[in-house]
A protein has these predicted regions:
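Conserved acidic donor-binding segment of nucleotide-sugar-dependent glycosyltransferases
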Residues: 77-89, 97-104
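Acidic donor-binding loop of glycosyltransferase active sites
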Residues: 31-46, 59
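Nucleotide-activated donor-binding/catalytic signature segment of Leloir-type glycosyltransferases, i.e.
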Residues: 3-21
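Short alpha-helical segment that forms part of, or immediately flanks, the ligand-binding pocket
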Residues: 27, 45, 49-56, 72-73, ...
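Short alpha-helical donor nucleotide-sugar binding micro-motif in glycosyltransferases
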Residues: 20-21, 28-33
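A short, well-ordered alpha-helix in the C-terminal region of glycosyltransferases
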Residues: 91, 98, 105-120, 126-132, ...
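Short hydrophobic beta-strand element within catalytic cores of glycosyltransferases
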Residues: 57-65
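Short acidic/histidine- and often glycine-rich active-site loop of Leloir-type glycosyltransferases
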Residues: 65-83
Length: 143
């Protein structure tokens, strides 16, 4: 179905469906892109870990502000990228262009993405936050 859409929009050669990409290959793909776009409109998109993967490679992110999800929290608007209203293809395209076509904006969001990853999402930071949560819960149960 997606390939049919690509063909009908005359995008063959411009859009390629990759299928499954192994964890080992991911950094190469993120390295090859200019901007990472998470265009999901589904409320089931709770967090969008793919954003963190892209941010770990210093890639600016364009994502959607899905209500009641963590997607727009992960991608801090105007820090690590731009968040737009879900389902607004025009706003999504303009956000991608705003980053990809402006070197200063690209550099700022790229640096912001990597800094946000290092501040909040490294394995060590995530383990420390989980431990802090568990320690707090253990203290509550002992009282």
């Amino acid at each position: 179905k997606l390939q049919e859409e690509i063909n009908s929009m005359h995008l063959r050669g411009k859009v390629k469906l990759l299928g499954h990409v192994s964890d080992e290959e991911l950094p190469s793909y993120y390295g090859a892109c200019d901007v990472f776009c998470l265009s999901s409109v589904q409320k089931t998109e709770a967090f969008g870990i793919v954003q963190i993967e892209a941010m770990s490679c210093g890639k600016p992110v364009v994502a959607t502000k899905i209500p009641h999800s963590g997607v727009s929290w992960v991608n801090a608007h105007e820090e690590s990228g731009i968040n737009v209203v879900p389902g607004d293809a025009y706003a999504l395209a303009k956000a991608i262009e705003a980053i990809a076509e402006n070197g200063a904006a690209y550099d700022r969001y790229s640096e912001g993405a990597l800094n946000r990853y290092q501040k909040l999402f490294t394995k060590e930071k995530m383990i420390a936050k989980c431990k802090e949560l568990y320690d707090g819960l253990m203290k509550e149960t002992k009282q």
